[in-house]
Amino acid sequence: MKKSIIALATAFTVLFSTNTIHAKTNNPELTAIEIADSQLQSVYDAYFTVKDALIKSDSKLTSAKAKDLLTAITAVKMDKLKSNEHTVWMKVVKKLTADAKSISATTDLKKQRETFKTLSKSTYDLIKVSSPTEPIYKQYCPMADADWLSKEKAVKNPYYGSSMLTCGNVVETIK
């Protein structure tokens, strides 16, 4: 009886693990979506770290994070992007790259923040077609006359840092 139970348990284990492996490998659409999403996710994550460094008014950290952003941009495999993402990517990739290079090449906080304006515009255009899994908030500062993107609804202004940390408002929620 004990051997029968062990044999039955082994058979079920093999049956279910084979079925799971088959389901994972025979679903290329699921795999492609995961790859496409991850292609731009690293760009978005790096953008947010640049924004956070600007909030801290840390020009050296901002420069370093912009280098990480540049690495993420160059790592994107265009052939893995969804059609609508690819279309926008082709329109913004040169500007994204130039802005990331510009921010990484200086420790002048004023120049970094000025360049961040156009970096944010390009990132917004891209994230708008990416269907993020979590809400992204487009925020606006009237004093800087500039937008930026945030994962948090609470305003933390990258253009003025601690001197005007909460200046601005949410103008759009991207879902």
Can you describe what each PLM-predicted range is?
Residues 1-27:
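Bacterial Sec-dependent N-terminal signal peptides
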Residues 31-175:
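Mature extracytoplasmic or organellar-lumen-exposed domains after removal of signal/transit peptides
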